[in-house]
Design a protein with these regions (language model features):
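N-terminal subdomain of nucleotide-sugar transferases
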Residues: 1-41, 46-51
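Receiver (REC) domain switch-region micro-motif
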Residues: 3, 94, 116
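Active-site beta-loop-alpha junctions enriched in small/polar residues
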Residues: 8, 99, 123
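Generic structural signal for helix capping and beta-alpha/helix-loop junctions
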Residues: 13, 41, 62, 103, ...
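Structural motif
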Residues: 34, 96-97, 119
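Short, hinge-like loop/turn segments at secondary-structure boundaries
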Residues: 48-53, 112-113, 133-137
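Acceptor-binding helix/loop patch of EC 2.4 sugar-transfer enzymes
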Residues: 57-68, 117-148
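An amphipathic, basic-hydrophobic alpha-helix
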Residues: 62-94, 100-113, 145-148
């Protein structure tokens, strides 16, 4: 099976994603990993039989990711990249790592209608309740864990 994994960060060094991808490769699947790059890294690379595709990002997109479910700029920016990734690798299923990029994947997938697995590594809405910057102005009024 051709599996598209979506990660909203650099790769490597995420061991949870790497271990999961390697397990899928070892089980006979073809894994294509969408990830971001912030420097001069290879756009396409084979790492431990994981087909890594890196898409250029920047500090502004990174900061906008905190507002992904408040103001959808990040979602709109990522949707375009993810749509291109899906069109290029032609997966049979999409595996999303983490909630920040999930809405962008759902929107990008509307025209493909592929099955999606959402793997929430962390309960981000609960974790966000502990962030000091979300307990005071302006974070308290801009970012709502309930929306996540």
């Amino acid at each position: 099976m051709r599996i598209a994994m979506i990660l909203d960060a650099k790769f490597p060094p995420d061991p949870r994603v790497e271990n999961e991808a390697i397990s899928l490769v070892d089980a006979g699947h073809d894994v294509y990993l969408f990830c971001l790059k912030y420097a001069d890294e290879k756009e396409v690379e084979l790492i431990k039989n994981i087909n890594v595709r890196r898409y250029k990002s920047n500090k502004l997109e990174y900061k906008l990711s905190a507002l992904a479910y408040t103001i959808p700029f990040y979602t709109l920016l990522m949707k375009k990249k993810i749509h291109q990734f899906i069109k290029t690798v032609k997966p049979e299923v999409i595996h999303i790592h983490d909630i920040k990029i999930a809405e962008a994947v759902f929107r990008a997938n509307k025209s493909f209608q592929l099955p999606i697995i959402l793997d929430l590594h962390d309960n981000l809405p609960e974790v966000m309740k502990l962030y000091p910057h979300l307990q005071k102005f302006p974070g308290k009024y801009i970012i709502s864990p309930k929306e996540w």
